Amino acid sequence: MEELIIRNVTFQDLPQVVDIQVRGWQAAYRGIIDDDILDTLDKNEKLEKRKKDFDSNGFIVAELKNKVVGFCRYVDNDKHSIIVPGIDCELLALYVEPTLKHNGIGTKLFNYVVDEFKSKNKKSMILWCLKDNEPSKKFYTKMGGTIVSQKMFEVKGRSYPEVGFLYEL
């Protein structure tokens, strides 16, 4: 694989980010999240949300051959995961172009985020994954995470169980 570049997101990246997110959901969550939800994901709605995220810290992309092939959102606080005590940072989202999975892109994005947190002296990172998403759970376990909690994830008025992976940095 040619050289992968990890960099901060630009406004021009957002349509590619949204495309990866929507197709990622449809590929990874089929059989986990109801089909009617997956089949009606609104890219414009997702784009508006990503535009709001754009100015925040912790929004990176993986670029290969001048094309966005993955992205991450992360925060160096515990505002999103107050149900787990002692957390001081969180990986909010990690997505890879579905046709390019198992090429090390997710690992490089993950490690970039961990290095960022370590440089800020963060100690305990959490990320949430749908409980029935076995491939992602396997990846997050391989990356050193331990399941420490469970909560419900709400989408379009329906609830799905998520598990929280803890990483001691």
Describe the residue ranges of each PLM region.
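Acetyl-CoA-dependent GNAT
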Residues: 8-14, 22-31, 38-99, 110-112, ...
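Amphipathic alpha-helical recognition patches that constitute DNA-binding helices
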Residues: 16, 90, 104, 108, ...
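Conserved acetyl-CoA-binding loop-helix of GNAT-fold acetyltransferases
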Residues: 102-115, 138-142
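Active-site acidic-Proline motif in GNAT/NAT acetyltransferases
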Residues: 97-99, 103, 131-132
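Short coil/turn segments at alpha/beta junctions that flank glycine-rich nucleotide-binding fingerprints
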Residues: 103, 120-123
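C-terminal "cap" of GNAT-fold acetyltransferases
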Residues: 85-89, 123-126, 130-137, 141-169
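Extreme N-terminal starter segment of soluble prokaryotic enzymes
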Residues: 2-5
